[in-house]
Amino acid sequence: MILMKDIVRDGDPVLRQVAQKLTFPLSDHYRKLADDMMEYLVNSQDPKIAAKHQLRAGVGLAAPQVGEGVSMAALLVPDDKGEIIFKEVYVNPEIISESVRKTCLSEGEGCLSVDKVIDGYVPRPNKVTVHYWTVDGEEKAIRLKGYPAIVSGHEIDHLNGHLFYDRINKENPFALDEDTIVIY
C-alpha cells in the first residue's frame, strides 16, 4: 500500500523529468503500480482509512510522484457531493485537443508532492480530449470538461516534468482572463 512516506516531494529530480512511455503488454510490476496508485486514491478519499494511515486526500497520482519515471497516472475524481464522476488509469496519455477557454479552482490547486500552500489560480483548458491506453492496452480518447479536465491536466503535467505552480502567473497570482470559468 502506498503511504505518504512513499510520495516523492518537490525537489526530487524525477518530478522534473519527462516520463518514459510504457510498452504493452504491461509488466506485472507496472500493473501492480497502477493498482497501488488507484488504491491510494480510494483510501485517501475514505475518511476512516485516510485518518488511520495519515493519508492526504488526492484525486490524482502520477507515477513520478511515487518515484517511477513512467507515463502512467491514476485519477479518481469526485463531484461536490463525493460521488465519483471519473475513474481511470492513464497509460501514455496526452492531451490532443483543448479549449481556448480556461477554467480554474477557486482555491487554487494542491499536490501530494508539494507540502506547502502556493497561492494563486492555476488556469487550465476548460475542455480537453485525452488520448491514452488503459492498463490492458486498450486505446481510448475521452473528452472531459471542468474538474475532470483540470485533474487530467494536472496529472499529465507531472508526466511532462511540470508542477501546478509553474502555471501560476508570477506577476499577479490571482489574475485571470475575463472569460475564465472559476469552479467553486
Swiss-Prot record:
Keywords: Hydrolase, Iron, Metal-binding, Protein biosynthesis. Transmembrane segments: none annotated. Binds 1 Fe(2+) ion. Its cofactor is Fe(2+). SUPFAM superfamilies: Peptide deformylase. The active site is at E155. Coiled coil: none annotated. Its EC number is 3.5.1.88. It comes from the Bacteria. It holds the Pfam family Pep_deformylase. GO terms for molecular function: metal ion binding; peptide deformylase activity. Fe cation binds at C111, H154, H158. It is an enzyme of class 3 (hydrolase). Gene3D superfamilies: Peptide deformylase. GO terms for biological process: co-translational protein modification; translation. It catalyses: N-terminal N-formyl-L-methionyl-[peptide] + H2O = N-terminal L-methionyl-[peptide] + formate. Belongs to the polypeptide deformylase family. Removes the formyl group from the N-terminal Met of newly synthesized proteins. Requires at least a dipeptide for an efficient rate of reaction. N-terminal L-methionine is a prerequisite for activity but the enzyme has broad specificity at other positions. NCBIfam families: pept_deformyl. This is Peptide deformylase. The gene is def.
